Amino acid sequence: MITLIFISIGMTLTSFVVSKNNLWPVTILQSAFLSIAAIALINNHWISKWHNFINSVDSMQLPLLVLSCWLTPLALIASKGHLNNLPITNQRTFIVLVIIITTSLIITFSSLELILFYIAFETTLVPTLILITRWGALMERFQAGLYFIFYTLFGSLPLLISLIALYFSSNSLSIPNVELVWLTTNSSTSLTVWWLLSILAFLVKMPIYGFHLWLPKAHVEAPVAGSMILAAILLKLGGYGLMRLISLFSTTSLNFSSLPLVVFCCWGALVTSIICIRQTDLKALIAYSSVGHMSIVAAGVFSQTIWGINGALMLMIAHGLVSSALFALANTMYERSGTRTLVITRGMKLILPLSTFWWLIMCAANLGFPYSNLIGEILYISWYGWSIWCSYFSNYNCVWGVYSLMIFQVSQQGPSSHFLLNVPTSFSREHLLFLLHLLPLLLIIPTPNLVLISWLK
């Protein structure tokens, strides 16, 4: 972990001193080296449930850590096109903010101390807010930033209160120590209150349906790198927090509230799928689809089953790659057409046929088509034996496929608008970007052990 943090610090320093002509190549090369260093952890045989008492890398954290480092160079590659014409100071600031977010995510996904986890968890807010308000497309970006900061901050305050109460009760905020002390020295009532305070921050951060109002605004107004990082990684902080703290929750509280929460999450996924069908803004549609997917992730965690939690992690990794690719594809269309309205950008297959291929692949992956995140969807079949109510909502969630097909049908089929006939063709940089999103997806089904939690019992 220290190696990854030092590489991130070196990237920050380099972005200030490298020349203008070499800024993007050097930064992307360094971020690629960061990705390789993270991938090298996969074959580390010393990785177990608890690696040491300050930082940990287990089979729950490792996939999310690798995903964070993998998407950093991809976000920079996607942003290079529209940032090249800005002043060099703005370009350096943008790169530094992306690196700060990556460093905070590395600390978050490798932290055993809950207070360090909370600090790194909240540190991601400030650079993301600056990305939205400074490099957003329209004046509504300030309102989007206001929604983003207030929802996430007010949702995190109860978590801070619960951590303070946890420290005074157990004299420690290290997760292994808390597992031994907290559950044996507190009543079921105090554990229930602590559980209710803790999950609110994660439900807002994911977010599930009902806590999601900040997400569509933030996605629509954010630049492409902000949307990619927000959808692919920052939303996963909520799911990771739920999975990490699930062992500290009261069994009585979980058994009492699991069924209502799982049913609510499944119902929210169904509602957001219907909302997606009514959307005309491409980025808003992808943002609402993220709400639906993360609601299903929360349902898998709340089910407390091995298959449900493994399915949640599998779906988070696959959704991170697919949603990032969809936002990158939406950005390529926006750069050429100047609009995100689906009806106006129709008929793109006649203008950008190679991009149509990537749209087909990613829309199919978004609905769980093999070889993508199908195994994550299969793991959720465990719901059928867990609760009959979940099986009902799971059957109705076939609506998911409708909006994924609608994205491809409306944007790629039909006659082209006349003002789109002279747009530039696709660049090799863009095809490389989409290919690097696809390659990890193809590894999930043949090698699921890279993602599944090995120590979970």
From Swiss-Prot:
Transmembrane regions listed in the UniProt entry: 22-42, 59-79, 95-115, 116-136, 148-168, 191-211, 223-243, 257-277, 282-302, 309-329, 350-370, 433-453
Principal location listed in the UniProt entry: mitochondrion
GO cellular component: mitochondrial membrane
Keyword Membrane: yes
One GO term (biological process): ATP synthesis coupled electron transport
EC assignment: 7.1.1.2
Compartments where found: Mitochondrion membrane
Superkingdom of the organism of origin: Eukaryota
InterPro entries, per database record: NADH4_N (IPR000260), NADH_UbQ_OxRdtase (IPR003918), ND/Mrp_TM (IPR001750)
An MF annotation (GO) of this entry: ubiquinone binding
Keywords: Electron transport, Membrane, Mitochondrion, NAD, Respiratory chain, Translocase, Transmembrane, Transmembrane helix, Transport, Ubiquinone
Membrane-topology descriptor: Multi-pass membrane protein
Swiss-Prot/TrEMBL catalytic activity: a ubiquinone + NADH + 5 H(+)(in) = a ubiquinol + NAD(+) + 4 H(+)(out)
Function: Core subunit of the mitochondrial membrane respiratory chain NADH dehydrogenase (Complex I) that is believed to belong to the minimal assembly required for catalysis. Complex I functions in the transfer of electrons from NADH to the respiratory chain. The immediate electron acceptor for the enzyme is believed to be ubiquinone.
Family to which this protein belongs: Belongs to the complex I subunit 4 family.
Protein name: NADH-ubiquinone oxidoreductase chain 4
Source taxonomy: Eukaryota, Metazoa, Echinodermata, Eleutherozoa, Echinozoa
